[in-house]
């Protein structure tokens, strides 16, 4: 019996040593992508975004809730360490002025110092990143709250032509 146990222990030890010598496999996991950002908010000026975890998913939150303050501009910074090409782009619909052109990670979209509310937005991923991840986002709209729910990959969040301010924006990037 002792001889059998010794042989089993030797075999297990040899297997363990072989496994530890295998080359590491690079993983392109969801943890290799993240965001930060800021919003220009009525009365508060530039405010840093905050990261929360909603249902276990990293979520960038911009703006305020329950304070009746308009978001006037946003800036989203993408941290892409996936090895895939691509970035995040967004555009916003502004009071009086309408839609901006698509803006790339790290660039502001909207206005500051003009007292103009954001009313709607669209967000999308580009390049290989868009083939492997979805961007989903939800806005808190004056009077309507969160009733629109989550929208994905360039869909419109918010309203146009209704004079309703965006108060809060939540953004997630999730694997497909």
Put a short name on every predicted segment.
Residues 1-12:
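Bacterial N-terminal signal peptides that target proteins for export
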Residues 10, 19-33:
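Sec-dependent signal peptide cleavage junction
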Residues 29-176:
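Lectin-type carbohydrate-recognition ectodomains
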